[in-house]
Amino acid sequence: MIKYIALASVVLLVGCSSTAKKPIADDPFYAPVYPDTVPTQVAATGSIYLDSQASSLYSDIRAHRVGDIITVTLKESTQASKSANNEIKKGSDLSVEPVYAGGKNISISGVPIDLGYSDSMNTKRESDADQSNSLDGSISANIIQVLSNGNLVIRGEKWISINNGDEFIRVTGMIRSEDINPDNTIDSTRVANARIQYSGTGTFADSQKVGWLSSFFMSDWWPF
């Protein structure tokens, strides 16, 4: 009977587990954004100079329109540490005075009746956790929206195929046009509401995942 209960518990745990959605290379959400094509009426004057193809010596070539490309320089570094100490002490004492009857101390085999009880408990827990991450590189992204206040919403991804797996970098966020460098780049630290994802798919990425049984032992469901 115990075997069947254990087997049923394992089946229920496996059934409750969820599988995360795997990223795909051609995700429509990260598809390139193209600017709207507006036909320009150009008068045929016979001149080799055309206003539609001219650019000023003082014009700004930095990205500022929907569909323009901007390069995000990834300079991310995070470090966190956490420690916790917890100590619980509990004690109780109970004593009963000698029992008297008729002015005499009641005893058993000459030993007076005297009850006493003492209990104490001491629990102490200590935990430390350290984590640090760094990400350096660059990725080009599209401007997908120009807000009314001039801020730009960007989005882009990069996929790299290596051996039996793929690695990808994705970035989304909001930037100010004033923070764009003259070479049309911007530091990732200047991206507001940034969502930067660096991961991979394939055999190497799967080998770094924790199995469902190990996840159970490290979850809150494990009583110990």
From Swiss-Prot:
Gene Ontology annotations of biological process type: bacterial-type flagellum-dependent cell motility
UniProt GO MF annotations: cytoskeletal motor activity
Function field: Assembles around the rod to form the L-ring and probably protects the motor/basal body from shearing forces during rotation.
Lipidation (N-palmitoyl cysteine): C16
Annotated InterPro entries: Flag_Lring
Subunit structure: The basal body constitutes a major portion of the flagellar organelle and consists of four rings (L,P,S, and M) mounted on a central rod.
Protein name: Flagellar L-ring protein
Membrane-related topology note: Lipid-anchor
